């Protein structure tokens, strides 16, 4: 695999593997090799659940078990992990078999989400529980700041998606139309196309995720759901 791509990924993760073979295994789908990432994924899934549960317990001392469970489910579900994978540009690093490559596996949410969990397992084996806990909390910083008990825990993208799914309408599409500024200080502009709205709605933010959330917020307002 291209070392430039691997080094770029490690910078985005905020962690450099001592055992590079663990990183390569974490990026390997079962379609590509018998030494794939599913065992690492199993481990990472449990670690992620523990770290997020522990952090929610610390942040919300008066919230009951049911609300904490719902918040944890929101934070560790597949589409959240896939969104995080796209922030890392993980798709370009995946090791996939010919069939998955041909069918666009590098874009598939389930593969992206599973790979994030495998990376968590890999970092843990390469270091220790304290290192991976710190890293997970860094990755989740903005999401943990935004989440709250009850329905308000759902971010605009999630609320918009659930609204459309409940009416059997197509999911919204998000398109980056402009990126301005230097790498350390960028502004993203997103167009969001939503069934029921004649024109795309526009969102801007300092990251693609924030711009998409801003666009979804505008869509909810136009649909009079906010």
Curated annotation (Swiss-Prot):
- Kinase as UniProt keyword: no
Task: Give the multimer and partner information.
Answer: Homodimer.
Q: Which residues bind Mg(2+)?
A: 41, 114, 117
Q: Name one GO cellular component term.
A: cytosol
- Give the protein's recorded name: Ribonuclease 3
> Which key words tag this protein in UniProt?
Cytoplasm, Endonuclease, Hydrolase, Magnesium, Metal-binding, mRNA processing, Nuclease, RNA-binding, rRNA processing, rRNA-binding, tRNA processing
The cofactor named in the record is: Mg(2+)
Task: Report which reactions are catalysed by this protein.
Answer: Endonucleolytic cleavage to 5'-phosphomonoester
Function statement: Digests double-stranded RNA. Involved in the processing of primary rRNA transcript to yield the immediate precursors to the large and small rRNAs (23S and 16S). Processes some mRNAs, and tRNAs when they are encoded in the rRNA operon. Processes pre-crRNA and tracrRNA of type II CRISPR loci if present in the organism.
Gene name of this polypeptide: rnc
GO MF annotation, one? double-stranded RNA binding
**What organism, scientifically named, is this protein from?**
Yersinia pestis
| E.C. numbers | 3.1.26.3
Matches recorded under SMART domains: DSRM (SM00358), RIBOc (SM00535)
